[in-house]
């Protein structure tokens, strides 16, 4: 488990299925994710089983209230970890909308990036954001990511083609 000031990142468990179905079937939550709705219970259960079997560094994001009760608010992870080349792709979804815009994404990704560089010994973490998602783009910039490219009209979502902004962060840039 990774602990920050307001968030904790813990491994995914089978009983997270209910939250995953809720989050990833919510059009507002997934509007900048390229996913195919609806997500079924079977498909999400299979994904959880495969992810845990591969021991991928994918976590549920939790926050605790003043009484210490934990609430799951989203998920994050490092995907396609390549130990040979020292790189991975980062992703995050804050599924509980009442927690949007309060800095939970920044704190979560700070923990995840530290984990990637200091525990997994990565050299580089990559990420992408679809251009309409201004909040995600600002978050990447605040974390020190550098825009490395743009894939024009990379995905089709909600009746329009979206450009994908590609970001990268090297370990030595993170240490600064």
Regions found by a protein language model. Give the residues of each.
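Conserved GNAT-fold acetyl-CoA-binding loop/helix
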Residues: 28-49
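A short helix-loop-beta-strand connector motif used in the catalytic cores of GNAT acetyltransferases and
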Residues: 48-62
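Tryptophan-centered motif/residue detector
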Residues: 23, 47-48, 100, 174
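Acyl-donor (CoA/ACP) binding surface of acyl/acetyltransferases
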Residues: 1-12, 16-17, 58, 65-176
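DNA-binding alpha-helical recognition surfaces that contact promoter or target DNA
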Residues: 22, 46, 138, 142
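Hydrophobic pocket/interface hotspot
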Residues: 20-21, 29, 44, 90
């Amino acid at each position: 488990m990774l602990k920050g000031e307001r968030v904790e990142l813990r491994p995914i468990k089978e009983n997270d299925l209910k939250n995953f179905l809720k989050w990833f079937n919510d059009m507002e939550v997934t509007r900048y994710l390229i996913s195919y709705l609806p997500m079924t219970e079977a498909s999400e259960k299979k994904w959880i089983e495969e992810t845990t079997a591969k021991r991928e560094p994918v976590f549920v994001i939790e926050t605790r209230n003043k009484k210490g009760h934990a609430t799951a608010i989203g998920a994050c992870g490092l995907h396609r970890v390549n130990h040979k080349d020292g790189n991975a792709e980062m992703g995050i979804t804050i599924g509980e909308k009442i927690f949007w815009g309060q800095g939970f994404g920044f704190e979560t990704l700070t923990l995840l990036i530290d984990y990637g560089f200091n525990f997994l010994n990565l050299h580089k973490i990559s990420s992408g954001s679809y251009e309409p998602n201004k909040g995600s783009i600002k978050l990447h910039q605040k974390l020190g990511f550098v825009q490395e490219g743009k894939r024009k009209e990379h995905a089709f979502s909600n009746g329009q083609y979206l450009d994908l902004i590609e970001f990268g962060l090297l370990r030595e840039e993170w240490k600064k």
